[in-house]
């Protein structure tokens, strides 16, 4: 209701003719400015301009609108980024299981992989057999620059090209030796700037359930891949 009144006020101030504006501002002074009424009367308009009081009112309204809108925009942005982070892990989960079930690296063993990789890198989600053929890829090329320390445990969310503000990395909860990879995988997603890009770290393992936890990092700091398999379920 307050926001609607403020919007109406802005439109009246900016769009009405001078005589109508003068009457409207007089009414505004009586109802909102109280004892500033006399000061408002003493202010002289320059030709085609506004009084100091009127400019102060407009500046105040802009400040109020900014205070109302900016936090909501930030929340919406964070929610969108976190939803995309969950989708990243869903994509990696599906790719891992396709790699596992179909023995796509052709080694005769059903196993997972800890590599995002790139074209020509075998035993990776980007190129299971190392053929260099994009049709064999289980994930697209944007993952190549979104991964941290590919093939090993990720520590800090610092990657060349984050996806929706998140980097991905291999989880420290899972080994990277051949025996471990026969039964489990683990990927995590962490934000490049805590509380401005996202609030939560995410992870997923062979049980296929996305886990999440609120980052402990201060605002603006890189995420530290804090989610583990013991975290609560987070949807997806």
Give the residues covered by each predicted segment.
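Aliphatic-rich helix starts adjacent to a transmembrane/signal segment
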Residues: 72-89
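Disulfide-bonded cysteine motifs in exported proteins
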Residues: 5, 152-155, 228-229
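Extracellular/periplasmic head regions of type IV pilus-like filament subunits
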Residues: 94-200, 206-207, 233-236
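N-terminal leader/signal peptides at the extreme start of proteins
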Residues: 1-50
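N-terminal single-pass transmembrane signal-anchor helix
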Residues: 46-73
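Chalcogenol-based redox active-site neighborhoods
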Residues: 69, 90, 229-232
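A short, surface-exposed interaction/processing loop segment used at functional sites
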Residues: 202-230
């Amino acid at each position: 209701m307050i926001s609607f009144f403020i919007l109406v006020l802005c439109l009246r101030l900016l769009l009405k003719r001078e005589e109508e504006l003068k009457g409207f501002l007089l009414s505004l002074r009586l109802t909102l400015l109280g004892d500033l009424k006399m000061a408002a009367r003493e202010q002289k308009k320059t030709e085609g301009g506004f009084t100091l009081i009127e400019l102060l009112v407009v500046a105040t309204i802009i400040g109020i609108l900014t205070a109302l809108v900016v936090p909501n925009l930030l929340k919406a942005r964070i929610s969108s980024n976190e939803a995309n982070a969950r989708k990243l892990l869903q994509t990696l989960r599906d790719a891992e299981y396709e790699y596992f079930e179909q023995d796509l690296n052709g080694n005769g063993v059903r196993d997972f992989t800890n590599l995002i990789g790139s074209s020509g890198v075998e035993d990776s989600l980007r190129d299971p057999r190392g053929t260099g053929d994009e049709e064999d890829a289980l994930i697209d090329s944007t993952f190549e620059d979104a991964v941290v320390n590919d093939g090993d445990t990720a520590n800090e969310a610092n990657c060349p090209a984050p996806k929706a503000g998140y980097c991905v990395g291999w989880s420290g909860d899972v080994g990277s030796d051949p025996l471990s990879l026969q039964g489990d995988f683990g990927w995590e997603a962490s934000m490049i700037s805590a509380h401005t890009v996202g609030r939560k770290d995410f992870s997923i393992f062979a049980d296929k359930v996305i886990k999440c936890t609120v980052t402990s990092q201060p605002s603006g700091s890189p995420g530290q891949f804090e989610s583990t398999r013991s975290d609560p379920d987070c949807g997806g």
